[in-house]
C-alpha cells in the first residue's frame, strides 16, 4: 500500500511595493477575484485572505497594501501598518517585484520579510512585459546577490505563466497540516466587504490620476431577497468639487460606475444585484485616523 502524499497548509504573506501585481497574483492562485485590481498604485488598501486549495495542500494568502516609504498622510500610515501586521504568525512570504526593476521600496519590502524570520520566495512578476528577454538573467543575478531567497520564480500573474512551480515550492515550505478552510471557500472577507471593493475598483479605473485616492466606499445596505441582493453603496469624497466629478454630467459617470460594479458583483456572487449608489462629502477623511477607523481601515 503506497503512502498517502502529505498535505501541507499554512499562511503566506504577499508583500511588495505598490503596483507590482500582488492582487493579480493572489487572484490567479485562488482562481477567483477576491482582491480588486487596477493599473494604479495603492489599489489594495486592506489586508485580506485569499484561499487557494489544491490536492497537495492549501495556501492561505495574505494579500496586503503595497509598502511605501512616504507616510505623510494617515491613509499611508494605516496601509503600511496593515502590510507589516500581516506578517504576524505567517509561515512564509512572497516578495513580489516587477521584472527589470528594483528600487528602495523593493528593498524595504525585502527587509520587512527578512526581519520577520520566515522563508522568503522571490516572485518576479510581469516577465511578459520585458522587451529584452536577455536582460532577465542578469537582473535576477543582481537582485539575488547577497539576499537569501528560498527559491526564485519569474512569472506572469496576468497570463498565469509559472504558477505551477511557484505553488509547488511554496507548499513545500509549509507545515504538514489539514486545510484551514473548506474547498469552496476563497476568502475570509464578507460579500458586503467585497461589494464595496468592487465599487472602489471602478473608481480607480474610471477617474483621473489623483481623485481615486480621495474616495472610499461604504456599504450602507446589503440584504438578500431570494436570489436578489439589494446593495446600497455610498462613495465618500473630500470636497464638493470631487463629488461633481464622480457624478459626471447628468449623472453619467456615476451610472457607469454603478453598472460595471453591478456586473462584477453578479459574476462574483452568482446572484442578481440591485445596486444603488450615492456620493457624499467628508472633508479630509483620508488624513483623519478617526474617519479611517470609521470606514473600516485597520
Swiss-Prot record:
Region (G2) location: 42-46
GO biological process, alphabetically ordered: ribosomal small subunit assembly
Assembly and oligomerization: Monomer.
Q: List the residue ranges of the region (G1).
A: 16-23
G4: region residues: 125-128
Domain Era-type G, chain residue ranges per copy: 8-176
Please give the organism.
Stenotrophomonas maltophilia (strain R551-3)
Q: How does it sit in the membrane?
A: Peripheral membrane protein
Q: Where is this region: G3?
A: 63-66
* Top-level taxon of origin: Bacteria
Task: Show the GO MF annotations.
Answer: GTP binding; GTPase activity; ribosomal small subunit binding; small ribosomal subunit rRNA binding
Q: Has the keyword Lyase been applied to this entry?
A: no
Region annotation (G5) ranges: 155-157
Instruction: Please tell me where GTP binds in this chain.
Output: 16-23, 63-67, 125-128
Recall the taxonomic lineage recorded for the source organism: Bacteria, Pseudomonadati, Pseudomonadota, Gammaproteobacteria, Lysobacterales
Q: What is this protein called?
A: GTPase Era
Amino acid at each position: 500500500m503506497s503512502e498517502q502524499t502529505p498535505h501541507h497548509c499554512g499562511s503566506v504573506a504577499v508583500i511588495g511595493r505598490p503596483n507590482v501585481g500582488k492582487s493579480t497574483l493572489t487572484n490567479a492562485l485562488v482562481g477567483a477575484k477576491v482582491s480588486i485590481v487596477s493599473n494604479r498604485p495603492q489599489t489594495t488598501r486592506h489586508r485580506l485572505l485569499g484561499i487557494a486549495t489544491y490536492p497537495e495542500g492549501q495556501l492561505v494568502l495574505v494579500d496586503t497594501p503595497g509598502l511605501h516609504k512616504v507616510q505623510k498622510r494617515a491613509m499611508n500610515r494605516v496601509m503600511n501598518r496593515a502590510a507589516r501586521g500581516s506578517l504576524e504568525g505567517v509561515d512564509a512570504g512572497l516578495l513580489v517585484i516587477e521584472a527589470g526593476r528594483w528600487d528602495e521600496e523593493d528593498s524595504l519590502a525585502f527587509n520587512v520579510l527578512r526581519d520577520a524570520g520566515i522563508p522568503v520566495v522571490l516572485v518576479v512578476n510581469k516577465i511578459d512585459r520585458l522587451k529584452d528577454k536577455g536582460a532577465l538573467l542578469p537582473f535576477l543575478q543582481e537582485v539575488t546577490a547577497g539576499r537569501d531567497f528560498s527559491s526564485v520564480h519569474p512569472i506572469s500573474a496576468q497570463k498565469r505563466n509559472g504558477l505551477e512551480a511557484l505553488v509547488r515550492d511554496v507548499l513545500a515550505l509549509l507545515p504538514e497540516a489539514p486545510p484551514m478552510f473548506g474547498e469552496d471557500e476563497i476568502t475570509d472577507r464578507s460579500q458586503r466587504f467585497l461589494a464595496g471593493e468592487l465599487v472602489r475598483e471602478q473608481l480607480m479605473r474610471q477617474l483621473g490620476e489623483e481623485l481615486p485616492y480621495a474616495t472610499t466606499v461604504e456599504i450602507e445596505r446589503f440584504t438578500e431577497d431570494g436570489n436578489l441582493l439589494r446593495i446600497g453603496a455610498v462613495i465618500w469624497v473630500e470636497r464638493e468639487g470631487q463629488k461633481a466629478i464622480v457624478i459626471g454630467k447628468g449623472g453619467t459617470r456615476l451610472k457607469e460606475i454603478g453598472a460595471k460594479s453591478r456586473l462584477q458583483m453578479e459574476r462574483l456572487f452568482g446572484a442578481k444585484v440591485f445596486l444603488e449608489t450615492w456620493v457624499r462629502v467628508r472633508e479630509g477623511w483620508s488624513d483623519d485616523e478617526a474617519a479611517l477607523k470609521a470606514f473600516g481601515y485597520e
